[in-house]
Each structure stands twice: as C-alpha cells, then as structure tokens.
Amino acid sequence: MDNKRLYNGNLSNIPEVIDPGITIPIYEEDIRNDTRMNTNARSVRVSDKRGRSSSTSPQKIGSYRTRAGRFSDTLTNLLPSISAKLHHSKKSTPVVVVPPTSSTPDSLNSTTYAPRVSSDSFTVATPLSLQSTTTRTRTRNNTVSSQITASSSLTTDVGNATSANIWSANAESNTSSSPLFDYPLATSYFEPLTRFKSTDNYTLPQTAQLNSFLEKNGNPNIWSSAGNSNTDHLNTPIVNRQRSQSQSTTNRVYTDAPYYQQPAQNYQVQVPPRVPKSTSISPVILDDVDPASINWITANQKVPLVNQISALLPTNTISISNVFPLQPTQQHQQNAVNLTSTSLATLCSQYGKVLSARTLRGLNMALVEFSTVESAICALEALQGKELSKVGAPSTVSFARVLPMYEQPLNVNGFNNTPKQPLLQEQLNHGVLNYQLQQSLQQPELQQQPTSFNQPNLTYCNPTQNLSHLQLSSNENEPYPFPLPPPSLSDSKKDILHTISSFKLEYDHLELNHLLQNALKNKGVSDTNYFGPLPEHNSKVPKRKDTFDAPKLRELRKQFDSNSLSTIEMEQLAIVMLDQLPELSSDYLGNTVIQKLFENSSNIIRDIMLRKCNKYLTSMGVHKNGTWVCQKIIKMANTPRQINLVTSGVSDYCTPLFNDQFGNYVIQGILKFGFPWNSFIFESVLSHFWTIVQNRYGSRAVRACLEADSIITQCQLLTITSLIIVLSPYLATDTNGTLLITWLLDTCTLPNKNLILCDKLVNKNLVKLCCHKLGSLTVLKILNLRGGEEEALSKNKIIHAIFDGPISSDSILFQILDEGNYGPTFIYKVLTSRILDNSVRDEAITKIRQLILNSNINLQSRQLLEEVGLSSAGISPKQSSKNHRKQHPQGFHSPGRARGVSVSSVRSSNSRHNSVIQMNNAGPTPALNFNPAPMSEINSYFNNQQVVYSGNQNQNQNGNSNGLDELNSQFDSFRIANGTNLSLPIVNLPNVSNNNNNYNNSGYSSQMNPLSRSVSHNNNNNTNNYNNNDNDNNNNNNNNNNNNNNNNNNNNNSNNSNNNNNNDTSLYRYRSYGY
C-alpha cells in the first residue's frame, strides 16, 4: 500500500460502496511531498490522475468479495453523482499535516500487532503521519452515499466541520468519569463513551435506543445540540442546504437511508420500559474470583477436570495461566483497587475491546473476554509463552468460554427454603460437586450456595475445596493409605543401595555413584506443563516473498513424492527454509516436507538444521504434527555432534516429555543412543520419580525404558528397579504406578526380586495394603504366583504374616478383619481361592471364627461369615466359648421355601444345595442354641442344632443324650459298599401345640424327596405319655421308632395344670449328592 494514506493507523476516512452485486474499495492518495500541498486544486488533480495511471492496482482488503476494475470507470458508470461529489470534495479539501504526537507506545505494545478488523491497520506508524481529527470508528452502515450526502448539506462554519472532515466536528473528547486508569493506546477500550463528542457530533446514531441508553447512563449531551438537554430527543444542528441531495439506488438497500435522505427532525423516541442488566458499559474487572462462582470451560489442562474440555473452537474468551496477584490479598480486608485484572485488561485492550477480565482464586489463572473472536485469536497468538506476571513463569494462553449460570429465584425469607432438585439437575445447573468421604464410599453432595449481589453471576460463600484432585475412576477416588508425598531420592538413597546389594549382582560402582549424584543435582524442569521456548509465528514478522505458505508446501510435497528434486536442490531448499524450520515443523503440511529434508540431506546440512531448531525440540515433540519431525530427527541423528545437539535440547525438559501424550515417544527414541547419551533420562526418573509414575503416559514410558534391557546398562536397571521396590507400597496403591509392580513380578529377570519385594510389603505395610482395594490386588497377585522355590517362599511369607501369631487385637489378622472397608473381602478371597492348603485353610477358619466370637469386631461381610460357618446377623461382641454357636436365622418368605447352604460353601465342599429343615409351629417361637464342635470331629458345613421351645416348660436333663456320635454313625451307615452316597429325605420339624388337656398333641407332617415315599416318623421313648398322632393324610403309614433321642415327657409339678414338655430334637443337614 505504497500510495494509500492512513490516518493514525485507522481506516476511518476510507469510504466504502456496498452494493448487492459488487463491493468496491476506495482509497485516497498519498501526498508525495510537502511542496505539492501548496499547489492549486487543478495541478493536484492532474498529478493524482497520473499517479493513478502509472501505479499498480491497489492491494485489496481480505473482506472484499470481488475485484474492482478501473476505479474511475466503475465509479463513474455505477454512481455518477457520488463520483462528482468525491471529485468536488477533493478540490475543496485542504490537506492538514499533523506532526506525530509525543506519546510513544511502550515496548510491549510496539512488538504486538493489532487484530485485523475494519477499523485497525497493520502499517507501522511513520514519523510524519497524516492525522485526522475524526472519530476513529465508523459503522459499516455508513455508506459512501450517506456520508457524502450528509457532508454536502453542512457548511464549513458550523462547528469546526469541513467537507473533508465529515466524521466529527472537533477534537474535544468526552470527559466522563471512568473507573479505570487512562489508556492512551486503548483505541477500542471504552468505545461507546470516549469516541463520541459531547456536543458537536453531526453523525447520527444507528438506532435511537442507543442514544436513550447512553443518556440514561450519565452522558446526556451525546448527539444533542444543547449542552443542558436531559431529554431523550435526537437534536440535530440547523444546517444550510446549498444544493439538493442526489438520490442513489444503493440507499434503498440499507435501513439507515431514511435518516440521511430526509431532513432531521426533533422527535421523541418511544422506548419500551425495561431494566438493563448492567448500568455500566465499562468492562467487568474482578480479582480473586472463586472458580466455582462462574460456569466456564477451557482447553487448558492445568485447570480442574470439571472445567476442562478436550477440544474447543476459537471463542471470544481466552484463559491465561501463571497470572499472579500484583498486591498481597489480606484475609480480612478486600483490595480497594483490582490491580491485577486492571493491568491485564490494559494489556489486552490493544488487541480489541475487552468485555471482562477476571483472575481466578487458587488457580493463578485469568479469564479475559473480548467483544470479537478475532481479538481473542490475536491476543492468544501474541501472548502465548510470554512472561506476563512473573519472570521465569511463561503463560499458557488457551481458548475458553464463559457459560451462562443457572440461577434459582431468590427467596425473601432465606436461602435455606429453596426447593430440592435431583443431583443430576443440580450438576448440570451449577457444575460443582463436592465429594465427602464416608468410610469406603465418596458420596457426591452438592454445595447449596446463595446468590451474591456483588457479582452478576452465581457465587459460593465458602469455597474451601480445590477440585484439581478430582478423578473419574473409582480406584483413584480411594485415598492413599500412606502419607504423601513419598520419600525423596535423598531420603531413600540408603534403602536403594541396600536393595541393590540384595540382588547380589555385579555392577559398576563408579557408574552408580555418578548416576545418583547427578540425579540429586538434577535441575531439570519439574513443571509438567512447560515445554520450553516456542518458535516465532509467521504473523509476528513482516511477510516476505520467500514465505512458505500452504500452496507452496503442497507443491513441494508433490515434488518429493514424485522424486523430481535432486539432492542439491533439497539441500538448497533446506537452507532457504532455515528461518522457518521450527515453525514449519508443526504445520500439517510443513512437517512432511521437513522430514523429507532430514532424510535426504547430508550430515553437514543436518547439523545446520539441528543447530537452528534443537532448542525447540521439546515444544515440537509435544505437538501432534511436530512430534513426527522430532522423532525423524532423532532417528536420523548418527554422528556424535548430532546426538549431542539432540540431547542438549531435550535434557532440561525430560520430565514434561515423559508425561506428555506425544513427548514420551521422543524419550523412547533418545533411549537408543545408549550410555552415556541417555543417562539424563534415568537421572530425571530418579529425581522426579513420583511425578512421572503417577501419570498415565509417564508410567508406561518408564516401563518401556526398563524393557529395553539390550540398550540400558546393568547399573541403570538395578537403580530403577530398586527404587520401584523401595516405593512399592505407594506404587501398589496408585492406578498407574501399579503397572511397574506388574512389570517387576511378571517381566523382570533379576534374581530374588519376589523375596525382596515381599520383605518391603510385609514390613509395616501389609495391613494397609490388604485393606486397600487396589493394593490388595498386588498382595493377591503375589499369593497366586506359580513357579519355583522363590515364589513359594514369598507366598508362605505373606500367609504366615497374616494367619500366624496370637489371637489378640494386635495381630495382623485382627487388624484386617476390623477394617470396615476392604479387609474382610480380602480374607474372603484368600479363603475361597486355591492359595491355601486344606490344613492351613482349616486352621485359618478356626482362628477367624474365634476372633469373631471373642472380640469386638463388627464384621459386615456376609460372605466371610458364611464361609467360616457363622451367621451374618445376631453375632454379639465378646461371646464366650460357653455360648452356643448360631446358625442362619430360619426366617423365610414362604412356608414352602427354605434357605440353604451358601454358594461359596457349596462350591468349596463339592456338596449339593439342599434346603434346610423347615420349622412350622403354632406355639411359642423356638429359640435356637448351637453347640460348637471341633473341626476335627465334624465338617464345618454341618451344624448340630438344638431346638428348645419356650413357655412353662422344664428341660428334662435325664432324657438328653449326645446325638453327635449317633449322627456320625448314621452318616456312615448311609454309604453303599462301593462308596456311593444316597440322597436322604429332608425331615420337617414337628408342629408342637399345647391344648387344655394334659397331654402332648404332636402332628408330624413330613415332605419327602420327589423320588422317595412320604413317611411320617413319630419317635417316643416314654410309654407313660398319651400320644395322639394326627396326620392330614390318612393314607400315610405311621411308624413308631425309638431310634432318635426325641423325648416327650409329661411331668407333674406344683402347678397341676402345667404341661412340661422337653423336646430335644437333634437337627442336622444331610449330605446330598446327585442321582
């Protein structure tokens, strides 16, 4: 734009002609020198015509849709009246040369570039610029026809307006108060308040509502001819019309044409009554805002998960990290001035109009909202990687979005009476959930917070919880049983050396000392979100002819694919692209071209290219396109010079690369360089071990390094393996860290690894691991190891540590059972698996039963109780051995259904599921007492039950006999010679009822197996009693047997009418096998 004149970096004096069919840019010519200013109008016009004919066609703005031909011909043919007025205005318009102002922009503003909007320019200011006193903005609806016709009706003596200065009247600025500081360079910061003159502005507003709105906000003189007018009238000055206005067909297209074609009138605007949401047009500037008070999302990965989003299109809002407060915040006193957000708004105002600027509490982040998306894009490109708030802490700028908050209607009486809503609805409305730990569960609970009247959004009163630790997996929600963070390298150095010596392998002591010393002195970046410097973007430098844009890159890629370029041409191309090499490496087309150049260039050219981009290898390696170039560079590096250049550019950022999705492949590629080039990788792992292994990608990258046993040295393998064993309790309880424990147990080939690991787990950590859901899986994995002597020894060491020892509250078994989270479940898994031998299992069940009956353990695991033969209800604490052992409560849903043996018991004892004997009685409820039997005498799944009926009844001590031996003998008699067991009938309990007569009426109704006959058995040993056998089925056979020890005794005591019955029925379960 050599021949185009700019007015103080503004295109306000460049009129436009917008026609439905064509769009034509109109420019005004530059004044070549100062002598031409004094020539007459005719000479100026002749010289301008010559200049236009000799110059090339002007560069067109990107927003115009069509090309314009010859400007003069097109303008004359389409709009003759406008062309005449334009030439008339050039004849009578003197050019005013204004020297540059003394105010200069600061260094930061001089290096940044404004967005490409219709009111801004990219041309750098010159020492002598043509400055106009017009308003710096104009609306797009101000067409050329409307502007010229409006200017032709004005005289030069009304105010200070001339025909050349048609946008404003004078240079008097608005002096309305602003809550912020003075921003001389913020040309679009307070546009509605500062760009309109108070008295002599002849440009009509676009809508009448804006005039009324501004007058109601403390500026009554906008667009008003009278300074003391406080009404909502649109007052225009009285002007002299020298000639009639020319009509144009283009005026009919626009809605504002009647305002410019008709005489201005004084009329009152009828505005519907409404209450504006905000009475201030200035941007919202807030410091130390609670992140939960606004509903916002961003693509930055440093924010809490509730505010993260994987992909976000460009928006008008950006999030800036590493924004620290400029002044200390007092706990009991609010800051009088928002210094941080105000300075941030000042900085961002040069890229466009700022609507709001907020700094978030506890996150060191800020949200800046612009009026347009283009302003946000420009600010993101300019501020990316800059040290905005603190030296050494570059800021990461990402797109963000502030979503509307759901606000419930306020309650006059208070906020506690708000109606309850479902949890999912509250989550959608507010987006904040607090997790409260209750034993083993983390139940989500919504924080009900009142609405704040200080901010327009919904705020929260007591935000005390940082949501950055919020995880999605159930294992991650479980807290760590050990104090965090784990011991550092300096604290665990002795343990590492002791573990290395336990392997009893030979290694290089000098290499080990060198590795540990460098790891202790490691000064690499520990921030996993900082990836080093970024290459300069193309938009920040002046555009040159040799810039490689997308069409050129696409053409080069076609030439590479067709092998049409020679080696010399490729090397020449590499030298030409040298300045843009880091930037093109991250381009979706440029990265393929750079890879081809590294593949086909000589070592000298590769060295030159590496020296240019080695400091950007980290930022390239974490980019989805640049990582391919970075891996290609590592693959093609084959000389010591090239290897040194690659390692020097990556060594300081090893930890961020480990934890990145694409950067971890860069580390694995450098690993092949071997010792000593890859030593910095293991030094970084030792120095930042817990930071790396907690990450999803970091733990897998460490495992990949350990599996490359052909590349790494014996010392490096021993050091990392020893550190894994030392921190194994922490790794076993972490979702990503447990991958290294699995590698150690399954893949590692070091001797005695299992025994060394068991010593570390058993020593003071076994109880916490067994009671942790994820940690117990590691213990079970060790117990299920199959192999040689080492695996057996490690398994026995854990089993003896758990089940050996005294039966007391200090034992490991008691502590595991007493833990209400996951400890009983772990014991149940150990008992039901094939880990234990039969003898060890029986001893373990006996010990568990004794602990449960003789201690205060409130065991809630029904499966474990059934596995050891106890009931899941009715176990009272501190039961002595004199009390009888209880069995399952016989409460059934239907009379014909009975509860049977548990599934685990059936599976472990190879028995068939039978129904338990049913009890139906019309008399008092029977009380169940159980006599415990030793494990050696009776199977734990068969229970000797004793039914005693309550009432005015006395137990007959003489009639009781030991039925256990008889039951055992009967079980033995039910075997056939070949060892096959028979299915026995299931006998129901008798229905015992007492009547007014002094005799016992016992009705026996039995239900036989479907394959056997129905038989009722009445057993009586006392011949002095009256026995009445009433059966519902008269066809049943009644057999009187004296085999069982069931005695019905009628004893006469002092109460003549009392009937004392002692029914000592020995109940048992029968072993039942399939037919």
UniProtKB/Swiss-Prot annotation:
Keywords: Cytoplasm, Phosphoprotein, Repeat, RNA-binding. Pfam families: PUF, RRM_1. GO terms for molecular function: mRNA 3'-UTR AU-rich region binding; mRNA binding. Residues 93-105, 901-916, 997-1009, 1018-1063 have a biased composition (Low complexity). Present with 377 molecules/cell in log phase SD medium. The modification Phosphoserine is found at S72, S198, S872, S876. Residues 38-68, 93-112, 874-931, 997-1075 are annotated as: Disordered. InterPro entries: ARM-like, ARM-type_fold, Nucleotide-bd_a/b_plait_sf, PUM-HD, Pumilio_domain_protein, Pumilio_RNA-bd_rpt, RBD_domain_sf, RRM_dom. PANTHER family: PROTEIN JSN1-RELATED (PTHR47093:SF1). It comes from the Eukaryota. It comes from Saccharomyces cerevisiae (strain ATCC 204508 / S288c) (Baker's yeast). Pumilio repeats lie at residues 574-611, 612-647, 649-683, 684-719, 722-758, 760-800. It is found in: Cytoplasm. GO terms for biological process: nuclear-transcribed mRNA catabolic process, deadenylation-dependent decay. This is mRNA-binding protein PUF2.
